[in-house]
Amino acid sequence: MGVGGTLEYISELIGNGGSHSYGKRKKKKQFQTVELKVRMDCDGCVLKIKNSLSSLKGVKTVEINKKQQKVTVSGYADASKVLKKAKATGKKAEIWPYVPYNLVAQPYIAQAYDKKAPPGYVRKVDPNVTTGTMAVYYDDPSYTSLFSDDNPNACSIM
């Protein structure tokens, strides 16, 4: 145990009030930005959301874009706790479901286009989902059998 280890040991003793926690170390939360989609109708709703999320421990900034119904929370708070706190205000809240249009490799999947998406955004879609893009193959009758006398579903113009 060098000088660095000794200083670390002493700071842990002082920081924990003298309790011995040799093997237990607290995980430091990482700084993160959480984006939410929250339904807000009026300025009162905006104020209610802002005050609620600002009171959360670890939150540094709360930015609200009322036009896009978007709330951006920056700080050391966990995303699930931020979402839970936003829902506790009585508003419909979810993690921001959109990504900028230019970041999507192929936004040609049918579910990516959402009429409610803000301009320049498309809905996040799992790239493995290919619903609607797969062609359905079935046995086409050959052209020679379409006009055959043996085929009851053949040309019936007469």
From Swiss-Prot:
PTM annotation (Cysteine methyl ester): residues: 155
Coiled-coil residue spans: none
PROSITE patterns: HMA_2 (PS50846)
Gene3D superfamilies (alphabetical): 3.30.70.100
Entry binding sites for a metal cation: 42, 45
Recorded GO MF terms: metal ion binding
Keyword terms: Lipoprotein, Metal-binding, Methylation, Prenylation
InterPro entries attached to this UniProt entry: HMA_dom, HMA_dom_sf
Residue span(s) of domain HMA: 31-94
Source taxon at top rank: Eukaryota
S-farnesyl cysteine lipid modification positions: 155
Propiece residue ranges: 156-158
Subunit structure: Interacts with ZHD11/HB29.
Family: Belongs to the HIPP family.
Stated role: Heavy-metal-binding protein.
Protein name: Heavy metal-associated isoprenylated plant protein 23
Source organism of this protein record: Arabidopsis thaliana (Mouse-ear cress)
Lineage of source species: Eukaryota, Viridiplantae, Streptophyta, Embryophyta, Tracheophyta
